[in-house]
Regions:
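Short beta-strands and strand-loop turn motifs
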Residues: 103-105, 130-138, 165, 183-186
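Short, conserved phosphate/pyrophosphate- and ester-handling motifs at nucleotide-, phospho-/glycolipid
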Residues: 46, 185, 249
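Conserved phosphate-binding/catalytic region of the ribokinase-like
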Residues: 172, 198-316
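Glycine-rich phosphate/adenosyl-contacting loop at the front of the ribokinase-like
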Residues: 1-56, 65-66, 239-241, 307-316
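Conserved phosphate/ATP/ADP-binding segment of small-molecule kinases
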Residues: 146-231
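Structural motif
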Residues: 1-3, 102, 131-132, 212
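Conserved N-terminal subdomain of the carbohydrate kinase-like
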Residues: 48-131, 296-316
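Hydrophobic anchor at the start of a short beta-strand
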Residues: 2, 51-54, 78, 162, ...
């Protein structure tokens, strides 16, 4: 079983429009609602891959009830931690046109110390039967800054590998605990390190405690610093992928978690992450992927050793 933890889940609302133009009125062509948040999206992708998964998340109010009902309908196991009365799960809105997506994120509800204790206990109770743990997304107000570090240590005590996908202090505050892999995007990587070159920045995160870093670089694929070497993985330039990119990173995390659970070698793990991420872009909503596209992309992915720019060292 792969356990996903989403401390700040959301009800994802997606509006489809022909073309998004700021400062004008739009006629919405389609509306879709589903349980979301980064870890929930990861669980949905894992479920689509046929992997057994349990999504752990705090749920509150009528919005939280909608999330739970959606996960139940999808057949995804959910361990929901109930929040106090009057506390409601947030919403996100994605406006998607033929070219790109614009996403609006509500702030999460403030969690109490009791909420955190219950969430931590829920995760701890699942670890003895877990093969991998995924920690995804922002920490809502009220959670301690070292919440992810605490969960990483709990997992390591049980011999469970951890994939962390977070930004800012939620990422940097967990590095010393030694997550098995962290998956920032290019912006998050630079923000965490202050280093412009992605390879040097990834090495800096390893120096800070991460055991591996897999950075998503958009159309340039993935850059990875791992115990087995430094790698770049991407589709060939002629394999143009267009669609909704909002769930691409979560699909990559799902592939990495599955690979860690199976102890897959890093080059193969990265190939699956690139192929699954591209297939997610071709699906209409986050947490989904096109299975045929996934199978078609996989043999096209090129995984090659990564080398630093001429004249630079791999890390500071």
């Amino acid at each position: 079983m792969i356990v996903t933890v989403t401390p700040n889940p959301a009800l994802d609302i997606t509006y489809g429009v022909p073309a998004l133009r700021p400062h004008t009125s739009h006629r919405v062509a389609s509306v879709h609602e589903q349980a979301g948040g980064k870890g929930v999206n990861v669980a949905r992708v894992l479920h689509g891959l046929g992997r057994r998964t349990t999504a752990v998340l705090p749920l509150g109010g009528s919005t939280g009830a909608v999330l739970r009902a959606d996960l139940d309908r999808a057949g995804i196991a959910c361990l929901g931690v109930p929040l106090a009365a009057g506390t409601s799960t947030r919403r996100t809105v994605a406006v998607v046109d033929a070219v790109d997506a614009t996403v609006l994120n509500e702030p999460g509800p403030e969690l109490s110390a009791e909420d955190w204790t219950a969430l931590r206990a829920a995760v701890r109770g699942l670890l003895p039967t877990a093969r991998a743990l995924v920690l995804s997304g922002s920490l809502p107000p009220g959670l301690p800054g070292d919440a992810y570090a605490d969960l990483v240590r709990l997992a390591h005590d049980q011999g469970v590998p951890v994939v962390l996908d977070a930004d800012g202090a939620a990422l940097t505050g967990a590095l010393a605990a030694g997550p098995t892999a962290v998956k920032p995007n290019a912006v998050e990587l630079r923000r965490a390190t202050g280093i412009a070159d992605p390879l040097r920045a990834a090495h800096a995160l390893v120096d800070a405690g991460a055991r591996a870093v897999v950075a998503s670089l958009g159309p340039d694929g993935l850059l990875a610093v791992t115990p087995d070497g430094d790698w770049r993985a991407r589709l060939p330039p002629e394999a143009v992928v267009r669609g909704n990119p909002t769930g691409a990173g979560d699909a990559a995390v799902a592939a990495l978690a599955a690979a860690l659970a199976d102890r897959t070698p890093w080059p193969a793990a990265l190939a699956h992450a690139v192929a699954l991420s591209a297939a997610a872009v071709q699906a209409p909503y986050a947490g989904r992927f096109d299975p045929q596209a996934y199978r078609g992309h996989l043999p096209l992915v090129r995984v090659t050793p990564a080398t630093p720019p001429a004249g630079s060292a791999p890390s500071d």
